[in-house]
Amino acid sequence: ARATIQVYEETAGLMVNDPVLRTRKPLSVELGPGILGNIFDGIQRPLKTIAIKSGDVYIPRGVSVPALDKDVLWEFQPTKLGVGDVITGGDLYATVFENTLMQHHVALPPGSMGKISYIAPAGQYNLQDTVLELEFQGIKKKFTMLQTWPVRSPRPVASKLAADTPLLTGQRVLDALFPSVLGGTCAIPGAFGCGKTVISQALSKYSNSEAVVYVGCGERGNEMAEVLMDFPQLTMTLPDGREESVMKRTTLVANTSNMPVAAREASIYTGITIAEYFRDMGYNVSMMADSTSRWAEALREISGRLAEMPADSGYPAYLAARLASFYERAGKVKCLGSPDRNGSVTIVGAVSPPGGDFSDPVTSATLSIVQVFWGLDKKLAQRKHFPSVNWLISYSKYSKALESFYEKFDPDFIDIRTKAREVLQREDDLNEIVQLVGKDALAESDKITLETAKLLREDYLAQNAFTPYDKFCPFYKSVWMMRNIIHFNTLANQAVERAAGTDGHKITYSVIKHRLGDLFYRLVSQKFEDPAEGEEALVGKFKKLYDDLTTGFRNLEDEAR
């Protein structure tokens, strides 16, 4: 029997007849306390530790460092389980204080079971200390807080559940028009310079997930360096008002384009396995893969080395199957073991098709799998409209699943969103006419539609990720901003129609613009309201604007009669 082995590093030291030993297990990762706040490469080597040990900016050849530090002491707190209790795989038997943001639950590895013959008392232990001993059919087995898991096999769950909670990202265009769910699959395809990485980073910083795994897979080294510089300085505000570092809930898997191809192919699996580990504790985890195109290119390169038959564009024939097997590890699940708990993994994959061509094999295979498509547009990016999500081609198949959430949050929201979509679609239809005959030849209602669409485009969908007031937009602010813009559209159309049927002065779009300029300015300025002032203050301001719009138009109609 022959085995083909791709060597991970320089092969200069090897020669014929050198012995090759099997590790007797597939590529596995170490899972335990200490993962959060760490940065690994594609095969889970800790890059910080390597940098300190080697004192070099590059990873030296042949360096081998354990993924998790085995000597750090962790505060171990067992649950109510005691000696003589029976426990099975997935049961949580202790908690470990990981950091002020995350409580780390220690579970029995899947596939193990038995009667507890020893459980460590509360205290400080490292990852080599035995904290649990089980007896099953007369055989005793010891467990530490550390477990290993092969990256290519999904971790088992009790059952899959239907997702019904939205993934709130803080980006208005995504939350309002194309929402995803906790446990969803999203794709962000876009050409270079469209802002894929900024959207991925915004998701990592501000989304309502409890843990984030960010996989930089084959992207430029300076992008990962930027993430490494930014994330430790970023803070998130907790419901009780505390400021905590985003790094405390984040794990980075950095695999830049100058690292070996084999690790690039493995890095996505490493990331998803770490995400599943936190999901099994009952957390909602989101995983960003930036970018799956580079991962597919690594597959293509390895497939070429193995002399497999190439398919479309040189990619292997099993590309779609590999992508599907990765994306299907997302989802909301009922976790194994007791206590009863639900967790979820949301996957957001950035795709960078060459030249922004969406018919590329990786993009088309991804779009047939994922449920949410946030399509980035080069033209919008060139107009400096960010996030450059094209609202005409993007879609979300989760709108139906989230209806019950929206009904509870705000019963009017679904109608408002439908109207906003209609306005944006109508604007696209009118643009051709405007280019032929100019704006003045349009009907008054069409002029109002164009103005509303401009408000939606420039002051609602566009969002500046580098300002304190707009870097994160809470959902209540998104809803109220959209409500006021659509309210303006409805009132303006009503005013024009009513005045047309009377003998008084006609109300035209230019009259509205001239007479209600101050209200118009306030509509444009809604985005400058800072969420730091608190929900009550902001909703009060938005309600006042809503009432002022109603009053302003009523007065205008009275004068026209």
UniProtKB/Swiss-Prot annotation:
It is an enzyme of class 7 (translocase). Keywords: ATP-binding, Hydrogen ion transport, Ion transport, Nucleotide-binding, Translocase, Transport. It catalyses: ATP + H2O + 4 H(+)(in) = ADP + phosphate + 5 H(+)(out). High expression in the mesocotyl tip of etiolated seedlings compared to the base. Coiled coil: none annotated. GO terms for molecular function: ATP binding; ATP hydrolysis activity; proton-transporting ATPase activity, rotational mechanism. Its EC number is 7.1.2.2. It comes from the Eukaryota. V-ATPase is a heteromultimeric enzyme composed of a peripheral catalytic V1 complex (main components: subunits A, B, C, D, E, and F) attached to an integral membrane V0 proton pore complex (main component: the proteolipid protein). GO terms for biological process: ATP metabolic process; proton transmembrane transport. Pfam families: ATP-synt_ab, ATP-synt_ab_Xtn, ATP-synt_VA_C. PANTHER family: V-TYPE PROTON ATPASE CATALYTIC SUBUNIT A. Belongs to the ATPase alpha/beta chains family. GO terms for cellular component: plant-type vacuole; proton-transporting V-type ATPase, V1 domain. It comes from Zea mays. This is V-type proton ATPase catalytic subunit A.
